[in-house]
Curated annotation (Swiss-Prot):
The gene is glyA. It comes from the Bacteria. Its EC number is 2.1.2.1. It is an enzyme of class 2 (transferase). Keywords: Amino-acid biosynthesis, Cytoplasm, One-carbon metabolism, Pyridoxal phosphate, Transferase. Pfam families: SHMT. (6S)-5,6,7,8-tetrahydrofolate binds at residues 132, 136-138. It is found in: Cytoplasm. Belongs to the SHMT family. One of its GO terms (biological process) is glycine biosynthetic process from serine. This is Serine hydroxymethyltransferase. Homodimer. The record marks 240 as: Plays an important role in substrate specificity.
């Protein structure tokens, strides 16, 4: 046999080689991250653990395909199979949330919100959103964000006494500034949103109502949180967080004329070719959320959050607004004499992953903070229940109480002991075996 025949029959390492063979450094980083996820308790409210099916779809050959446009109207040939995937994602999103129209192409939560601005606002227009310091989001008008640079922003906030949104104040503010858009939703607000009242306020001043349900979309899908879709002109959400899918965005609405504006804003307004492998993974996750067991998951997320909040309160910690009705909570560390940055680092050393977070009217800078944000979606996914989250509350209290008594904010013996307890817990609930 000649050499050319041998070459033709030999596997091409470009297609057959493993990641470990092709790039051992990245392979090692991925292996390390898998180990971290397996052996730490994930309490970051915006994170979750996707199914192996979602991982498989996102790592599929659909990453190779360019598909500018929308199903049935592409600027490239060969899109018949990615059209199938995107159509499935669209139809599943519509069914899951009871919306007439859905755009599954946004690459991120920031881009989905930017698309709404592009479709509905002109530079210099006024909109309202919850202040970041009160639990809002960067894309809702923070001065450092595009939304705060290109538009006039009139923030509303929470009351000092109970840290709840004062809807009468929202109405007064709207009447004062006459916004073109009002945003409901945030990244660190643990209580219900009055979508009906927000829509009434928006209608009273001729504004659009946008609800960013990125954090609680999975709870809406699971039927344990009120849906904004019947009330909002447009609803946006990420597909990760409590929805438990790949990282990306989603736009929902019930008005055909607005849907066309949002489609044009995404493509060609903001994006070119969509990430078809991610859209395929979105379809998988949306399909999972349509199954009966997802309702059980969503119910457990909320029950676990309440159990964690009550456990922490039982150990003498203050919870902003007194508790939670969704998947997250803010811990006010000031009564313990602690800062968020120091507390986050100590908990991470103990295997309890969380993030420092500002609390309403926080006197500290954003990289210091007086609080911690804790969430239950990821650890609920791996099987933790109420009893485990009560234990987690005790472990958090153990670490924070120890560092509060230490001059340097470190308690290595306690942190190491808690880390062993964390490992024992996570070993009972393995992932990706």
């Amino acid at each position: 046999m000649d050499s050319s025949a041998k070459t033709a029959s030999a596997p091409d390492p470009f297609f057959a080689g493993t990641l470990a063979e092709a790039d051992p450094e990245i392979a090692a980083a991925i292996t390390g991250e898998l180990g971290r996820q397996r052996h730490e308790i994930e309490l970051i409210a915006s994170e979750n653990i996707v199914s192996r099916a979602v991982l498989e779809a996102q790592g599929s050959v659909m990453t190779n395909k360019y598909a500018e446009g929308y199903p049935g109207a592409r600027y490239y040939g060969g899109c018949e199979w990615v059209d199938v995937a995107e159509t499935l994602a669209i139809e599943r999103a519509k069914k899951l949330f009871g919306a007439r129209f859905a755009n599954v192409q946004p690459n991120s939560g920031s881009q989905m919100n930017q698309a709404v601005f592009l479709a509905l606002l002109q530079p210099g227009d006024t909109f309202m959103g919850l202040d970041l310091a009160a639990g809002g989001h960067l894309t809702h008008g923070a001065p450092v964000n595009m939304s705060g640079k290109w538009f006039k922003v009139a923030h509303y906030t929470v009351r000092r006494d109970d840290h709840l949104i004062d809807m009468d104040e929202v109405a007064r503010r709207a009447e004062e500034v006459k916004p073109k858009l009002i945003i409901a939703g945030g990244s660190a607000y643990s209580r219900p949103w009055d979508f009906k009242r927000f829509r009434e306020i928006a209608d009273s001043v001729g504004a659009y109502l946008m609800v960013d349900m990125a954090h609680f979309a999975g709870l809406v899908a699971g039927g344990v949180h009120a849906s904004p879709v019947p009330h909002a002109h447009v609803t946006t959400t990420t597909t990760h967080k409590s929805l438990r899918g790949p990282r990306g965005g989603l736009i929902l609405c019930n008005d055909e004329a607005l849907a066309k504006k949002f489609n044009s804003a995404i493509f060609p307004g903001l994006q070119g070719g969509p990430l078809m492998h991610v859209i395929a993974a979105k379809a998988v996750a949306l399909g999972e959320a349509l199954r009966p067991d997802f309702k059980i998951y969503a119910k457990n997320v909320v029950e676990n959050a309440r159990a964690l909040a009550e456990s922490l309160r039982g150990h003498g910690f203050d919870i902003v607004s007194g508790g939670t009705d969704n998947h997250l909570m803010l811990v006010d560390l000031r009564p313990k004499g602690l800062k968020g940055n120091v507390s986050e680092k100590a908990l991470v050393r103990a295997g309890l992953t969380c993030n420092k977070n500002g609390i309403p009217f926080d006197p500290e800078k954003p990289f210091v903070t007086s609080g911690l944000r804790l969430g239950t979606p990821a650890t609920t996914t791996r099987g933790f229940g109420v009893s485990e989250f009560k234990q987690v509350g005790g472990l958090i209290a153990e670490v924070l109480t120890a560092i509060a008594q230490a001059e340097d904010g470190k308690a290595p013996l306690v942190e190491a002991a808690v880390k062993e307890k964390v490992k024992a817990l996570t070993d009972r609930f393995p992932i990706y075996q």
